[in-house]
Every structure is written in structure tokens, then in C-alpha cells.
Curated annotation (Swiss-Prot):
It comes from the Eukaryota. Pfam families: FAM117. This is Protein FAM117A. Residues 436-451 have a biased composition (Polar residues). It comes from Mus musculus (Mouse). The modification Phosphothreonine is found at T353. Keywords: Coiled coil, Phosphoprotein. Residues 1-83, 164-183, 242-293, 403-451 are annotated as: Disordered. Residues 149-175 form a coiled coil. Belongs to the FAM117 family. Residues 1-25 have a biased composition (Gly residues). The modification Phosphoserine is found at S29, S67, S193, S213, S318, S326, S412, S426.
């Protein structure tokens, strides 16, 4: 292939600038001259036909014969490749930074810089095409690197202009909406011709049907949902529903005592309330006097008692200094929790308060006016009951079977005594409970409850 290419460049008897109709066959025999008549079918060629686009002959190889391919081989050493027109970047960082930012690296003067020549990476000059024949084919090239130097310079200038217009237009796009809904290429060209000026106030609100950028869309949504609603609608949205609202702060006139005794309502200076429009020094003096009088009137008896050191901590006679100490259970603090945010204060009925000394101790026993108890004494002693409260004893014990171990004897009439000897003899073998047998009036009971 290289021999065929060299033969095409050298010219010779094949014609000006043509490398033959079908190239060369793979072999040493030279092809037939172009003017000789072809007889019959030609053998199958093993090379791909090609044609060079060079109308003129080279000056250095014009007088050499091109009939033999090896005769034009020394031409390669004669032709020196010109400096290539391949652009190289300065460093890898330049490529990466510009690629990530979406910008094309450009030179200071807008032209190509001088690059070093490397035979291993440069394209030979023999493969390049002259500018005259390439003018008609420049629109069909795949990229700008296949074109001429002027074409690539023009493309580079266009890219630089586009980058400059993008940079100057980036500040304007945040505040301006797109006036055209369809084609944006014409919009970009029109904006590139506009002179750059400092950003002014935002453009007036356009119709919502027009296209907007991301910032414009956010602004439009904000106007729809916030600004277009009236003041009453905004107040209704911002109003906290009933039950979710935190309790109102207590008034100073009615809740001075709670403000003084609750440590949650005290600031860093414990005698100064939260909402104090006066200076701290003057307010602390006035509050100190007021707290002293109020606490002296409320806790006068407690402070006078020797066993209760509520207001005399660390030997200080001032009652307000008890609030500044650590919250010890010394009866100088009211341990009350403020309700959490969003909850209302509920007044609880105080049941667990300790009774005063004038109140009697309440027992859990039943009322003595309704229930009457009769003490029975020992369980083994006979007790005489009130007769009208019970029926006759004979009727009660008539149905009860008598047993030898039964503690309740049967009510039977006794035999009359015969004499003192007989009574002594009869009383000896008898049990202790049989010595005085009960009559109908007295029966052995352990206890009785009379209602």
C-alpha cells in the first residue's frame, strides 16, 4: 500500500496525480501502462482501490519515473513533515477543571500556541489534504480536528464567545424568566448580543403559563401560596388553634405571690422578675423590699420558730437570700412545675395537705352513733346478754344436738337439791363449767354485736 501511495504521488507515466485505476497487485511485476488496451478479464486484485485528491505534482519528485514502485521509496526521506496543527493542553489539571466546569480551555490570545513535535504521536504530512480540494468536503467531516487550521481557529473562537456569553448570562438568568416557550437557541443568540449591565430589580411577574427557570418557578410558587392569599387568610393559617396554645403569662397584680415563690419565673438575679422594664439595680432594690414584706407576712410564724431555719441560711438575716441558695427542702421554696409548652395550667384539689392542730384525727372505724360494740372480755368467760334482744333460749338450743364435747349445754330443768352432802358429792366429779349450770337467762357466748 505504501508503494502504491508513493507511486501515486510521484506521477510518471500513469498520469498527473493518479495512482492507477485499481492500484497495484500484490507482486513485483509493474502494472501495464495506462494507454495500453485491455484484452479480456483482468485477474482478481488483492488490494483495495483508492484515489488521492492531489491535482498537482510534487516539485521534488516530478522528474522521477514511477513505473516501478521501489523507485519512489527515497521520497520519504526527502519530505520533511511540517509542524502539526494538533492542539495540546498545558496540563492535565487544565483539562479536568474545565471539563468539570463545562468550559472549554482557551488561550490568552485566542490562537494556537507552539507545540513540541513528536514523531510517535503526530500525523504525517503526507496524509493531510491541501486546503483547495478540501473546501467542498469540509461540511462532511466528522469533527473539527479533520479540517483545516482556519476552520479550527474559527470553531475555537466561536466556543470562546459562547463561553463568555454564558458567564455573563449566568447572573441574568436567575432573575429573568424566559419570554419564549419554544426555541431557546434564538434566545441564547439574542442574549449574547445584549450588553452586560448590573442586575437590576426583578422583572415583573409574568403569566404563570410561560416557562420559567428553576428559580423563577420557586418564586412563582411562593407568590401563589403566600403572597396571593390575603392578610386574613395568613392570620387564619398562623393562628394557633385552641388547646394548642401555651398558657398566658400570669398578671403581676394577681400573681405576685406565685412570681415570688416559683423559681421557674425568676431570672439569674432571683429577686428580679422576667418582665421588668426598669433597670436591674432599681428593680432589684424594689423587689427586694417587696419580697421581704410579703415573705415576712406569709411566713412570719415559720421564721420565728427556732427549729425551722428557713430564712436564716448561713447566718444571713435576709429572707430573700434563701431563694439564692441551693434548692434544699427547707420550706423556703414551693416546688411547683410549670406546665410544658402547649399545655394549660390545671388547678388540682389539694387532698394530701396535712391537717392542722385544731382538726381531730380522722379514723377509719365506723361511726359509734350507728354501730354499738359490746366488749366480750375473754373468750372463755360467760357473758350475759340483754334478754329482750334475743328470743327464748329454749327455742334456740332445742334444735341443737348435745354432744359430750360441746361447750354449750342443753337447757334442762335441774333436780332439787337433797342436801349439802349430795351437792358436794355431785360437784366433785363434774367439770368446771358444770359447777354453775346456766339457766335460760345466761348462755355462754363469745361475743355479740348489737346493731
Amino acid at each position: 500500500m505504501s508503494g502504491a501511495a508513493a507511486g501515486g504521488r510521484g506521477g510518471g507515466s500513469w498520469g498527473p496525480g493518479r495512482g492507477g485505476a485499481g492500484g497495484l497487485r500484490r507482486g513485483c511485476s509493474p502494472p501495464a501502462p495506462a494507454g495500453s488496451p485491455r484484452v479480456g478479464l483482468q485477474p482478481l486484485r488483492a488490494t483495495v482501490p483508492f484515489q488521492l485528491q492531489q491535482p498537482h505534482q510534487r516539485r521534488d519528485g516530478g522528474g522521477r519515473a514511477a513505473s516501478v514502485p521501489c523507485s519512489v521509496a527515497p521520497e520519504k526521506s526527502v519530505c520533511r513533515p511540517q509542524p502539526p496543527q494538533v492542539r495540546r493542553t498545558f496540563s492535565l489539571d487544565t483539562i479536568l477543571s474545565s471539563y468539570l466546569l463545562g468550559q472549554w480551555p482557551r488561550d490568552a490570545d485566542g490562537a494556537f500556541t507552539c507545540c513540541t513535535n513528536d514523531k510517535a504521536t503526530q500525523t504525517p504530512l503526507s496524509w493531510q489534504e491541501p486546503e483547495g480540494e478540501r473546501a467542498s468536503f469540509c461540511m462532511h467531516k466528522r469533527s473539527a480536528s479533520w479540517g483545516s487550521t482556519d476552520h479550527r481557529k474559527e470553531i475555537t473562537k466561536l466556543k470562546q464567545q459562547l463561553q463568555r456569553t454564558k458567564l455573563s448570562r449566568s447572573g441574568k438568568e436567575k432573575e429573568r424568566s424566559c419570554p419564549v416557550q419554544g426555541d431557546h437557541a434564538a434566545l441564547g443568540a439574542g442574549r449574547a448580543s445584549l450588553p452586560s449591565h448590573p442586575p437590576g430589580p426583578p422583572v415583573l411577574r409574568l403569566s404563570p403559563c410561560l416557562h420559567r427557570s428553576l428559580e423563577g418557578l420557586n418564586q412563582e410558587l411562593e407568590e401563589v401560596f403566600v403572597k396571593e392569599q390575603g392578610e386574613e387568610e395568613l392570620l387564619r393559617i398562623l393562628e394557633v388553634p385552641d388547646g394548642h396554645r401555651a398558657p398566658a403569662p400570669p398578671q403581676n397584680s394577681s400573681c405576685d405571690h406565685s412570681l415570688l415563690l416559683e423559681p421557674g419565673n425568676l431570672t439569674s438575679s432571683p429577686s428580679v422578675p422576667l418582665a421588668s422594664p426598669q433597670p436591674p439595680s432599681q428593680a432589684s432594690r424594689e423587689e427586694h423590699q417587696g419580697a421581704t414584706e410579703e415573705l415576712a407576712s406569709i411566713h412570719g410564724n415559720k421564721a420565728s420558730s427556732p427549729g425551722n431555719p428557713a430564712f436564716l441560711e448561713d447566718g444571713s438575716p435576709s429572707p430573700v437570700l434563701a431563694f439564692a441558695a441551693s434548692p434544699r427542702p427547707n420550706h423556703s421554696y414551693v416546688f411547683k412545675r410549670e406546665p410544658p409548652e402547649g399545655c394549660e395550667r390545671v388547678r388540682v384539689f389539694e387532698e394530701a395537705t396535712s391537717p392542722g392542730p385544731d382538726l381531730a384525727f380522722l379514723t377509719s372505724c365506723p361511726d359509734k352513733n350507728k354501730v354499738h360494740f359490746n366488749p366480750t372480755g375473754s373468750a372463755f368467760c360467760p357473758v350475759s346478754l340483754i334478754k329482750p334482744l334475743f328470743p327464748s333460749m329454749g327455742f334456740i338450743f332445742r334444735n341443737c344436738p348435745s354432744s359430750p364435747g360441746s361447750p354449750l349445754p342443753t337447757a334442762s330443768p335441774r333436780a332439787p337439791r337433797k342436801g349439802p352432802e349430795a351437792s358436794k358429792a355431785s360437784s366433785l366429779p363434774s367439770e368446771p363449767w358444770q359447777r354453775s349450770p346456766p339457766s335460760e337467762e345466761s348462755v355462754l357466748f363469745q361475743s355479740s354485736l348489737v346493731v
